[in-house]
């Protein structure tokens, strides 16, 4: 089977209101989804596994779109379903918005970034209480909470810079977003946050690669594949200016 490869030079984490049109799908082929395996080597009854499982289910529902990030280049070897492709996916995005109290929005509202609503929904589906992970329509809201309480004894979501902590399955990785944004590596935790942020859920690390699932990534629930540094740390890239890792200490 020929590989279906599209190079993206200016990736914008936005909905279908962007100027990008959906690429044509590859020739139809029968796709067999492999049985779910515990590839992350964590207990299947743990909170982390439930979070990863919920995120993976949504990725499968949206057609398993993949985004490969290699230095400053990005590609989409497999295009999945987009937020406004059909009623099922339009309504699924509505379910994410309902998790943050915004029930009137759906996949048709293409200019409303829904990545934070997606993560809030995943946390709720996994059974994480709102007292531990406050649901929010904006990443800045829950990240500001973690920055304020993350150093308290017993904190379960603890922020780190990308230089001081190696991301693990169940963690969140966060980046600034917006056209043309590209800054230096953050050496200290910020005291305030940009309104335009994006976070993904780490689902696997293996052989120097990190796999993370997020909503509203190229108009879908996508799995991004990143190359870690030789020491296993997240690397800043032009299209993904990562600056923060939220360590998940839930058992």
Regions found by a protein language model. Give the residues of each.
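Short hydrophobic/aromatic-rich beta-strand motifs
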Residues: 1-2, 173
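Sec-dependent signal peptide recognition
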Residues: 2-8
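Large, modular interaction/toxin scaffolds in secreted and membrane-associated proteins
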Residues: 3, 19-20
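C-terminal motif of bacterial Sec signal peptides marking the signal peptidase cleavage site
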Residues: 12-15
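N-terminal capping segments
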Residues: 20-131
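Short, solvent-exposed loop/turn and secondary-structure capping segments
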Residues: 66-70, 132-135, 185-186, 223-225
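...with weaker cross-activation on analogous glycine-rich loops/strands in unrelated enzymes
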Residues: 135-218
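Low-complexity, Gly/Ser/Thr/Pro-rich intrinsically disordered linker/tail segments
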Residues: 216-251
């Amino acid at each position: 089977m020929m590989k279906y490869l599209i190079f993206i030079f200016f990736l914008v984490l936005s909905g279908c209101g962007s100027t990008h049109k959906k690429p044509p799908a590859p020739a139809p082929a029968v796709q067999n989804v492999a049985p779910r395996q515990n590839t992350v080597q964590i207990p299947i009854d743990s909170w982390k596994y439930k979070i990863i499982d919920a995120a993976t289910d949504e990725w499968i529902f949206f057609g398993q779109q993949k985004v490969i990030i290699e230095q400053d280049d990005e590609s989409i070897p497999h295009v999945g379903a987009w937020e406004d492709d059909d009623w099922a996916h339009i309504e699924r995005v509505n379910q994410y918005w309902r998790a943050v109290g915004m029930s009137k929005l759906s996949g048709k509202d293409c200019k409303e970034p829904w990545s934070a609503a997606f993560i809030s929904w995943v946390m709720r589906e996994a059974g994480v209480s709102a007292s531990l992970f406050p649901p929010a329509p904006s990443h800045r809201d829950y990240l500001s909470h973690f920055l304020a309480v993350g150093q308290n004894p017993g904190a379960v979501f603890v922020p780190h810079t990308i230089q001081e902590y190696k991301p693990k399955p169940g963690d969140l990785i966060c980046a600034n977003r917006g056209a043309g944004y590209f800054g230096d590596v953050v050496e200290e935790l910020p005291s305030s946050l940009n309104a335009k942020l994006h976070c993904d859920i780490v689902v696997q690390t293996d052989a120097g690669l990190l796999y993370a699932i997020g909503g509203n990534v190229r108009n879908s629930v996508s799995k991004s594949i990143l190359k870690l540094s030789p020491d296993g740390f997240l690397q800043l890239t032009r299209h993904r200016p990562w600056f923060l890792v939220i360590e998940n200490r839930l058992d």
